[in-house]
From Swiss-Prot:
Family: Belongs to the ABC transporter superfamily. ABCG family. Eye pigment precursor importer (TC 3.A.1.204) subfamily.
EC number(s) per entry: 7.6.2.2
Protein name: Broad substrate specificity ATP-binding cassette transporter ABCG2
Gene that this polypeptide is encoded by: Abcg2
Catalytic activity: ATP + H2O + xenobioticSide 1 = ADP + phosphate + xenobioticSide 2; riboflavin(in) + ATP + H2O = riboflavin(out) + ADP + phosphate + H(+); pheophorbide a(in) + ATP + H2O = pheophorbide a(out) + ADP + phosphate + H(+); urate(in) + ATP + H2O = urate(out) + ADP + phosphate + H(+)
Subunit structure and binding partners: Homodimer; disulfide-linked. The minimal functional unit is a homodimer, but the major oligomeric form in plasma membrane is a homotetramer with possibility of higher order oligomerization up to homododecamers.
Tissue: Highly expressed in kidney. Lower expression in liver, colon, heart, spleen, and placenta. Expressed in mammary gland. Expressed in intestinal villi and renal proximal tubules, hepatic bile canalicular membranes, and placental labyrinth cells (at protein level).
Species for this entry: Mus musculus
Length: 657
């Protein structure tokens, strides 16, 4: 008669299909064995700049000679703020900048495989899930990109349904996660969704960065109970946490205490109180052990003062007791190194196969992908398009504003006449259309800024290539959001304004506005990619467009600008758009009533411009067809250049912490 807690025998080929090194060569093993992660002499240093006027580079040690072992179960990393717990977690998960990092992280006694970041799970502190999608759709996205294409769809759906059931998300499986504009699921359900995204690959090792942050005590307890159940299935769960309550603390199997980058305890969580008592720090009755440990480390516990008094009375020390935090941490660190628990850990580390071989910390490696570029492109484009439709504030609202603005401008410039005023108004409205296309494209700065954390997490986890993400976003988000407003704007305005009544002129104007929008959006991407704050990129875009307006050809005649500044006109997006629109509208037009365009005579007033051709010549615009199309060629070249810059910035973006 078996119980639900009995160990389940699973063939190794089925259990450890993520490619992690195995501890033995037996054909079967219990789930409770799992994978063992060990770390040897981990030291991490970073260079920080200090000073206001004179910036000096100072090396700061974040982690100092950390050794330990994480077995299947709940492995908690605890410590005060700035103690190094998140840094240690990132090092173990192979997500830390390799510069300044030394030491070895082994899996079952062997070096971490190149695809370790892809086959292990990592749940970030700030849940990075697409809020406009449902819980099921987010899991489907993870399954589509992280599971091999050889796996059939019904098998992927079965795994998704199993995870939803295991995480208790059945009631909200088809509910949207939620955004700042859309009401969604609760914080605990959102956290479980993030965990489910990582469980898709059935990882044997799961990392979580402060999984209880932002959750109330009851929800946090529920999340840890879920992790405890998962650990009993043979998973090695490693997480950082800050001040857990006792009901959570008693779930821990292993506890790692860090302070100022030094290891003050690493061993079974239930032996921690006994260990601190042997060091002279006794936990008060009814005190939370986790709070007690942090109080001792911070030096503000009554146990610390009692310990100092005992040391003074018993040892009759002549030196004054230190009042700062550092001596307490140093004493605890030295006591741990000389303790029996450290000796047991050291012996266990030495017994691991391959532990004596010094591998050295490997450099940052690119993720290994299980799907093709086209497969990734299709799913990224699909998710981006769903996100666009599920976010009406960014899609529908923009189209409505475009229609309203078009009607207002059409009413102001309604039915332009063929006279001097009509010529002036035509130039004015064409200039407005060009600049409006530029400034309305500033919203493109959010394309890669808002999803920066999401992109970095998914890229490191092996969801997709940088190229797949870039082109998928451009195809599904950038193109339609700039294409449709331009088409609507042209259709609403063209006939209200009474512009040139030819089919060619209509579509040339539409094409020109589309090209201007694409170029301005590409420039926005080139400036904003890699930025963390939208407002900075928006400010830079606005300043750039204001300077470009000066060289558009309306506010100042470009032929009158000095040669030392005239070269700036070739970098002006509005100039190319405005020039093309003027050529399209003014060529062959007559603006003097009764004047014959075919007549070579001039107007009675030699200072008057009676034809569109004269106006174009006065503006320095060529009358040949190349005078029109060279502007579109220039815009196309700028699009290619700006998108290339954006892609390279995304490619070389710092993707590790």
């Amino acid at each position: 008669m078996s119980s639900s807690n009995d160990h389940v025998l699973v063939p190794m080929s089925q259990r450890n299909n993520n490619g992690l090194p195995r501890t033995n060569s037996r054909a079967v093993r219990t789930l409770a064995e799992g994978d063992v992660l060990s770390f040897h002499h981990i030291t991490y240093r970073v260079k920080v700049k200090s000073g206001f006027l004179v910036r000096k580079t100072v090396e700061k040690e974040i982690l100092s000679d950390i050794n330990g072992i994480m077995k299947p179960g709940l492995n908690a990393i605890l410590g005060p703020t700035g103690g190094g717990k998140s840094s240690l977690l990132d090092v173990l998960a192979a997500r830390k900048d390799p510069k300044g990092l030394s030491g070895d992280v082994l899996i079952n006694g062997a070096p971490q495989p190149a695809h370790f970041k892809c086959c292990s799970g990592y749940v970030v502190q700030d849940d990075v899930v697409m809020g406009t999608l449902t819980v099921r759709e987010n899991l489907q996205f993870s399954a589509a990109l992280r599971l091999p294409t050889t796996m059939k769809n019904h098998e992927k759906n079965e795994r998704i349904n199993t995870i939803i059931k295991e995480l208790g998300l059945e009631k909200v499986a088809d509910s949207k996660v939620g955004t700042q504009f859309i009401r969604g699921i609760s914080g605990g359900e959102r956290k479980r969704t993030s965990i489910g995204m990582e469980l898709i690959t059935d990882p044997s090792i799961l990392f979580l960065d402060e999984p209880t942050t932002g959750l109330d005590s009851s929800t946090a307890n529920a999340v840890l109970l879920l992790l405890k159940r998962m650990s009993k299935q043979g998973r090695t769960i490693i997480f950082s946490i800050h001040q857990p309550r006792y009901s959570i603390f008693k779930l821990f199997d292993s506890l790692t205490l860090l302070a100022s980058g030094k290891l003050v305890f690493h061993g079974p969580a239930q032996k921690a109180l006994e260990y601190f008592a042997s060091a002279g720090y006794h936990c008060e009755p009814y005190n939370n052990p986790a709070d007690f440990f942090l109080d001792v480390i911070n030096g503000d516990s009554s146990a610390v003062m009692l310990n100092r008094e005992e040391q003074d009375n018993e040892a009759n020390k002549t030196e004054e007791p230190s009042k700062g935090e550092k001596p307490v941490i140093e004493n605890l660190s030295e006591f741990y190194i000389n303790s029996a628990i450290y000796g047991e850990t050291k012996a266990e580390l030495d017994q691991l196969p391959g532990a004596q071989e010094k591998k050295g910390t490997s450099a940052f490696k690119e993720p290994v992908y299980v799907t093709s570029f086209c497969h990734q492109l299709r799913w990224i484009a699909r998710r981006s398009f769903k996100n666009l439709l599920g976010n009406p504030q960014a899609s529908v609202a923009q189209l409505i504003v475009t229609v309203i603005l078009g009607l207002i401008i059409g009413a102001i410039y309604f039915d332009l006449k063929y006279d001097a005023a009509g010529m002036q108004n035509r130039a004015g409205v064409l200039f407005f259309l060009t600049t409006n296309q530029c400034f309305s494209s500033v919203s493109a700065v959010e394309l890669f800024v808002v999803e920066k954390k999401l992109f970095i997490h998914e890229y490191i986890s092996g969801y997709y290539r940088v190229s797949s993400y870039f082109f998928g976003k451009v195809m599904s988000d950038l193109l339609p959001m700039r294409f449709l407003p331009s088409v609507i704007f042209t259709c609403v305005l063209y006939f209200m304004l009474g512009l040139k009544k030819t089919v060619d002129a209509f579509f040339i104007m539409m094409f020109t506005l589309i090209m201007v929008a694409y170029t301005a959006s590409s420039m926005a991407l080139a400036i904003a990619t890699g930025q963390s704050v939208v407002s900075v990129a928006t400010l830079l875009m606005t300043i750039a467009f204001v300077f470009m307006m000066l060289f558009s050809g309306l506010l100042v005649n470009l032929r009158t600008i000095g040669p030392w500044l005239s070269w700036l006109q070739y970098f002006s997006i509005p100039r190319y758009g405005f020039t093309a629109l003027q050529y399209n509208e003014f060529l062959g037009q007559e603006f003097c009533p009764g004047f014959n365009v075919t007549d070579n005579s001039t107007c009675v007033n030699s200072y008057a411009i009676c034809t569109g051709n004269e106006y174009l010549i006065n503006q320095g615009i060529e009358l040949s067809p190349w005078g029109l199309w060279k502007n579109h060629v220039a815009l196309a070249c700028m699009i290619i250049i700006f998108l290339t810059i954006a892609y390279l910035k995304l490619l070389f973006l710092k993707k590790y912490s």
